């Protein structure tokens, strides 16, 4: 798990986010900081208690669809891929692979359980100078063709 996390203003600077209580907003930031490299948090209730948030704050994040709750109690940050992009040499896949297998990804990089493309890490994990794994393979093929 990294020590640095990013936040995308297109998610944070919305009425849906800013109209939530400050305690709920703070919980969202704390959950993001403690998430693994795929955006999963295995102990959201412990984090709630640790930071002084209530379970109502957690329920509000679920209701407003900022986080997705799985049956086993694990959560994932819905907009994780919008917020963060990791290089392949720093990326460590989540331990929650069964939950991850249920996810799809929308065109805007938000996780979903419904409609979307199957999750393909090669498109979202960066290699080197801001290239994804897929982009690197494409560029390599172009170089070989020439």
Regions found by a protein language model. Name each.
Residues 23-27, 43, 57:
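Short N-terminal amphipathic alpha-helix/helix-capping patch enriched in small hydrophobics
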């Amino acid at each position: 798990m990294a020590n640095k996390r990013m936040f995308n203003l297109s998610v944070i600077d919305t009425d849906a986010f800013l109209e939530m209580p400050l305690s709920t907003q703070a919980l969202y930031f704390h959950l993001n900081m403690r998430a693994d490299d795929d955006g999963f948090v295995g102990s959201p209730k412990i984090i709630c208690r640790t930071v002084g948030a209530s379970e109502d704050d957690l329920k509000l994040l679920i209701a407003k669809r900022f986080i997705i709750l799985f049956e086993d109690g694990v959560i994932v940050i819905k907009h994780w891929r919008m917020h963060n992009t990791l290089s392949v040499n720093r990326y460590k896949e989540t331990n929650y692979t069964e939950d991850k297998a249920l996810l799809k990804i929308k065109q805007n990089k938000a996780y979903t359980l419904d409609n979307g493309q199957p999750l393909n890490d090669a498109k979202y994990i960066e290699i080197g100078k801001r290239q994804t794994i897929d982009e690197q393979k494409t560029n390599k093929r172009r170089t070989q063709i020439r």
